């Protein structure tokens, strides 16, 4: 099927393909239109004859995770001619895109608002028996419309089942495993060849948070002749960089986060509430308002930030309660890309400001374990990630990370809702999804057709 044939083709009887959003070894991603309702969707195509098919496997994981807060709706999956097709909700920009727009630095306030949701997303995946194994900024996207302030976790190409939900049996501890995921954000144990478990997703998330705060990580930009040599250099630098050095000049809660994650044993269930509480208490002590005004809003319209400035509050030296520790570059965006991306940011922000003046506050568990192990083996055998990213897909040339060892495809999930501590009147999750006022803070984001760039080293 050539390009013109694709554009004229109707998927599943009602989704017409629009412009191409991205492509790569995973297949192709298109904007789609529901010809019955006019709704815009994302359509992912994978050639039926591809060497390592994964779209059906991915769609099953997607269906299995349906019902979690922020999990996009899987609208259709099937085969049309020469392609397997998956139709899903359309999402907004990734955190890496927004990070670049904000000149590659996020404020502490934005990082803390994001951290709460990111932990929830990872917890939800874990609660359904799966590890993500490729936690990075590209794999978190903001929503659109009424879910504009909600973070979505995408890309289940490297997801792995770590326990049976019926028997609660955990996968066995193993060593001598190849690095799976993205080297920049991989946990120390992953570098050491140890089978990944829940603790590793959370350690990777910690590196993402420090990347946002610092602007970069100490092991970025290392030169090497081969991929293995580069992984070895990253591993060495990561292990030589103490948590205290990594988090120097930043609140001690980030140091506590890493110490806790690294104290977990292989099969330990993390105390996700404790980790959220670390950052929520810090948020309160800093005097921030939970208004969901992020840096990408303020960077275009500084006056919007006036309502979100921290109120002067006492800052007692608290030692947040928690469980005892059981010890055991992306290149600069090209002018053409930057222009299109900046235009999209400005367009959506302009609409939001005019619609509300100063921005206000705002922002299902299925039981089926029929993910085939054969499909898991297939996508664990893939080598190299070369996909370009549209609104939906995340790993692309020039993405925020070292190339994944295995190719990871683009799909979505998100976390469940959680009650806050007694000091917070409304949960971060419910605030992000429930306030019609500030839903416009990222509302109606123009589609970002991100082209290919150079692969980051």
From Swiss-Prot:
PANTHER family: CASEIN KINASE-RELATED (PTHR11909). Casein kinases are operationally defined by their preferential utilization of acidic proteins such as caseins as substrates. Can phosphorylate casein, phosvitin, myosin light chains and poly(Glu,Tyr) in vitro. Belongs to the protein kinase superfamily. CK1 Ser/Thr protein kinase family. Casein kinase I subfamily. Autophosphorylated. It is found in: Cytoplasm; Nucleus. Residues 311-324 have a biased composition (Pro residues). InterPro entries: CK1_Ser-Thr_kinase, Kinase-like_dom_sf, Prot_kinase_dom, Protein_kinase_ATP_BS, Ser/Thr_kinase_AS. Keywords: ATP-binding, Cytoplasm, Kinase, Nucleotide-binding, Nucleus, Serine/threonine-protein kinase, Transferase. It catalyses: L-seryl-[protein] + ATP = O-phospho-L-seryl-[protein] + ADP + H(+); L-threonyl-[protein] + ATP = O-phospho-L-threonyl-[protein] + ADP + H(+). It comes from Arabidopsis thaliana. This is Casein kinase 1-like protein 11. ATP binds at residues 21-29, 44. Residues 305-337, 352-442 are annotated as: Disordered. GO terms for cellular component: cytoplasm; nucleus.
């Amino acid at each position: 099927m050539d390009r013109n044939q694709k554009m004229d083709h109707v998927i599943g009887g009602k989704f017409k393909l629009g412009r191409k959003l991205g492509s790569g070894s995973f297949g192709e991603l298109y904007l789609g239109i529901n010809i019955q309702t006019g709704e815009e969707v994302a359509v992912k195509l994978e050639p039926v004859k591809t060497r390592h098919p994964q779209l059906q496997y991915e769609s099953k994981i997607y269906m299995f995770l349906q019902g979690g807060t922020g999990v996009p709706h899987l609208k259709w999956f099937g085969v049309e001619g020469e392609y397997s097709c998956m139709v899903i909700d359309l999402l907004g920009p990734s955190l890496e895109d927004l990070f670049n727009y904000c000149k590659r630095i996020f404020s502490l306030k934005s990082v803390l608002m994001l951290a709460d949701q990111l932990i929830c997303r990872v917890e939800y995946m874990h609660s359904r028996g799966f590890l993500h194994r490729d936690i990075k900024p590209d794999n978190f996207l903001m929503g659109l419309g009424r879910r504009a302030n909600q973070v979505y976790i995408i890309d289940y190409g490297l997801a792995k089942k770590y326990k049976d939900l019926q028997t609660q049996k955990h996968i066995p501890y193993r060593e001598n495993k190849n690095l799976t995921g993205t080297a920049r954000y991989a946990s120390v144990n992953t570098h050491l060849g140890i089978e990944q478990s829940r603790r590793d997703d959370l350690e990777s998330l910690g590196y993402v948070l420090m990347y946002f705060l610092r602007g970069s990580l100490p092991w970025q930009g290392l030169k090497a002749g081969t991929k293995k040599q580069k992984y070895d250099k990253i591993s060495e630098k990561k292990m030589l960089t103490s948590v205290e050095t990594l988090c120097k000049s930043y609140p001690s809660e980030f140091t506590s986060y890493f110490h806790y994650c690294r104290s977990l044993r292989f099969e330990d269930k993390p105390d996700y509430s404790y980790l959220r509480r670390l950052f929520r208490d810090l948020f309160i002590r800093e005097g921030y308002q939970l208004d969901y005004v992020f840096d990408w809003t303020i960077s275009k319209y500084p006056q919007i930030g006036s309502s979100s400035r921290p109120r002067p509050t006492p800052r007692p030296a608290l030692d947040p309660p928690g469980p005892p520790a059981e010890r055991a570059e992306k290149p600069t965006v090209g002018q053409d890309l930057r222009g299109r991306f900046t235009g999209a940011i400005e367009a959506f922000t302009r609409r939001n400001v005019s619609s509300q003046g100063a921005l206000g506050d705002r922002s299902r568990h299925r039981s089926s374990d029929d993910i085939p192990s054969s499909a898991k083996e297939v996508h664990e055998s893939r080598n190299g990630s070369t996909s370009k990213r549209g609104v939906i897909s995340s790993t692309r040339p020039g993405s925020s990370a070292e190339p994944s060892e295995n190719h990871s495809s683009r799909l979505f999930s998100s976390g469940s809702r959680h009650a806050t501590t007694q000091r917070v009147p409304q949960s971060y999750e419910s605030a992000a999804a429930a306030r019609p006022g500030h839903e416009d803070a990222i509302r109606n984001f123009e589609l970002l057709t991100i082209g290919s760039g150079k692969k980051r080293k």
